[in-house]
Amino acid sequence: DFLCTEEAVRAMFADQRDVSGDVEVLDEFGLDVLNQDTIKGYRIVFEQLHSGHPWNALENDEFLMKLRAAAKNKNGTLSPTIAGLLFFGEAYHITEIFPNYFLDYREECDDKAVRWLFRTHSNEGDWSGNIYDFFCKVRTRMDDDVAVPFANRRNGYRVDRVDVHDAL
């Protein structure tokens, strides 16, 4: 907390929005700009985490509207929201709206002669490049890289996850 001038407070009120910018409807796009495999993968994870949730029974269009990833546009048809495009869209459509959009993950080492050991980025072209798929791709890479010491539980099954997996 800090003391603001009256002018600064007026500026803050002028800048506030009643609606979050990420639910702005992108009227110029249809839902075909969203990657169906990403939506399918997200729904599988959603159902695993929220079994019995009423949204699991919804069709994709309704599900996306509940997530606020899609909404009716000025013509009354469905379009993605900014959040929906970023989360489920294809990188080449995302960069039409956000030209500087670029997700980049690198595994670097101390050897200055080696730029990186592994790299993936949203403009590779062989995957969607959206935020959700990027998260899944990087998380899987990090998860697979965790060393798991060989240990058996009392019931005879191998321990295949360690605390680091949970932290990730």
Report residues per predicted region.
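Active-site helix-to-loop segments that bind/position phosphate- or nucleotide-bearing substrates
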Residues: D1-L168
